[in-house]
UniProtKB/Swiss-Prot annotation:
It comes from Geobacillus thermodenitrificans (strain NG80-2). Its cofactor is Zn(2+). The gene is ybeY. Zn(2+) binds at residues 122, 126, 132. GO terms for biological process: rRNA processing. The keyword Hydrolase applies. This is Endoribonuclease YbeY. Pfam families: YbeY. GO terms for molecular function: metalloendopeptidase activity; RNA endonuclease activity; zinc ion binding.
Amino acid sequence: MTIQIDFIDETNEVTAEQIETLEQLIREAAAVENVPEGAEVSVSFVDNERIRVMNRDYRGKDAPTDVLSFALEEEGEGEIDIIGADVPPVLGDIIISIPKAKEQAAEYGHSFMRELGFLAVHGFLHLLGYDHETEEEERVMFAKQEEILTRFGLTR
């Protein structure tokens, strides 16, 4: 399963090796979820101020968060799907706060790489339509995250 993944590191704190691991992990998640060949996603690493502004502007929450996802394939109410069947989907953007990832890795007692992987998979699943607004949705989404991370070998 080949998908196009673009990484943008605004922090210069993520190593080439960590990016390679995340690329493999996202490809694994795409395979598990049967994402169409040629789909595209971008992953950006930012600081707390940048993600705080995005969280405020797009979610109305004026505080930094760990990960945001912006799905480009979501249909709004009353919209029709105009994407051709043969056009690879642009899934959207995943934005990860590096300071939050480091803080949470320390808080949960696991590696920075594990936390980055968790946040990347979490964001990726949001792009595919998973959510955690209800207890049932949360159970399904978090079980899927753990399945992918365990299958990849990125455990706590």
